[in-house]
Amino acid sequence: MTKKRVLSGVQPTGAIHIGNWLGAIRNWVSLQNEYDTYVCVVDLHAITVPHDPQQLKENTLRTAALYVACGMDPKKCSIFVQSHISAHSELCWLLNCVTPLNWMERMIQFKEKAIKQGDNVSIGLLDYPVLMAADILLYDADLVPVGEDQKQHLELARDIAQQRVNSRFNKESKSILKIPKPLIMKEGGKIMSLIDGNMKMSKSDPNENSRIALLDSPEIIKKKIKRAKTDSFLGLEFDNNQRPEANNLLGIYSMVSNQNREAVQKEFSNIGWGKFKPILTDAIIESLNPIQQKYYSLIKDKTELNNILNKGYIKANTISNQTLKRVRNALGFLDKPIS
């Protein structure tokens, strides 16, 4: 029986943090046993905002290495770099030409980021969701793991595929582009900031204390947890809207210690922050230790990492070119010459 295909990825911008790991990457690790899994380092998306070229190169390798260090198995999944597959850019352009401008202008994330960038906002930032649609549609993905903040982008990909390509250019019964479905993972879906329990933990937050990077040292982790925002209530609890920080920090502990919420609630219902924070700190350090060891082993000698990316490229390139050829033919382009 053919496995359903899953596609996901992370931008190589900033340091990957425990929110990325617990909210996304750790879920992908479990998915690779059940699905035909493709994991991409989405570096083309990283240049929609001002960036440092050398830092981009380093972050791209770092992100790929962390995928493997977190448990993505190259024998079970394909790990590749987005910009290595030229079909991403070509399909993006083809989709650009059939996607209405007003669809882009109503995207929430563009509006938010455009305000921050002012006159420096790029066309690439406006077009970001079309490139994301190309990423998804290029691999005939059946399912795409998404958080609540990405659901709008997946809906756009579905609309472009169905309304702007399949409905307009399909001359046969078989669809040109597969319509993907969202795969929403509930546990760890959203890890919040350490300094504001109402805000999502983010790589772009200028305050380093808002997040714990996967490569943070034990000393740094200890300092960040010590400074993490808390409240004045005695005892810790989940699901109290007046205590977002308690819910967040307990949730992190539950996941890094692999204990269910009921057990965690029982353990800490009568304990104060002063006793809880050192316990949380130790649990995070212990959970990140094997990831850090594997990462530094990979990054020290990049031969294995480059082989992994090359293997992923070959498989991803083959599938992406098949999809691109279908779209090119449907839109009326001549077949490319055989070199």
Swiss-Prot record:
PANTHER family for this protein: TRYPTOPHAN--TRNA LIGASE, MITOCHONDRIAL
According to the lineage, what is the superkingdom?
Bacteria
Q: Which SUPFAM superfamilies match?
A: Nucleotidylyl transferase
Assembly information from the UniProt record: Homodimer.
Q: What is this protein called?
A: Tryptophan--tRNA ligase
Q: Which family does it belong to?
A: Belongs to the class-I aminoacyl-tRNA synthetase family.
Indicate yes or no for the key word Protein biosynthesis. Answer: yes
Offer one example of a GO biological process linked to this entry: tryptophanyl-tRNA aminoacylation
Q: Where does ATP bind?
A: Q11, P12, T13, G19, N20, G147, E148, D149, I191, K200, M201, S202, K203, S204
Is-annotated flag, keyword NAD? no
Give one Pfam family: tRNA-synt_1b
The lineage is:
Bacteria, Bacillati, Cyanobacteriota, Cyanophyceae, Synechococcales
Positions occupied by motif 'KMSKS' region = 200-204
Positions occupied by motif 'HIGH' region: 12-20
- The entry's L-tryptophan-binding residues are D135
Instruction: Briefly state the protein's biological role.
Output: Catalyzes the attachment of tryptophan to tRNA(Trp).
Single GO MF annotation: tryptophan-tRNA ligase activity
Q: What is its main location?
A: cytoplasm
Q: Which Gene3D superfamilies match?
A: HUPs, Tyrosyl-Transfer RNA Synthetase
InterPro entries per the UniProt record, alphabetical: aa-tRNA-synth_Ic, Rossmann-like_a/b/a_fold, Trp-tRNA-ligase, Trp-tRNA-ligase_bac-type, Trp-tRNA_synthetase
User: Its catalytic activity?
Assistant: tRNA(Trp) + L-tryptophan + ATP = L-tryptophyl-tRNA(Trp) + AMP + diphosphate + H(+)
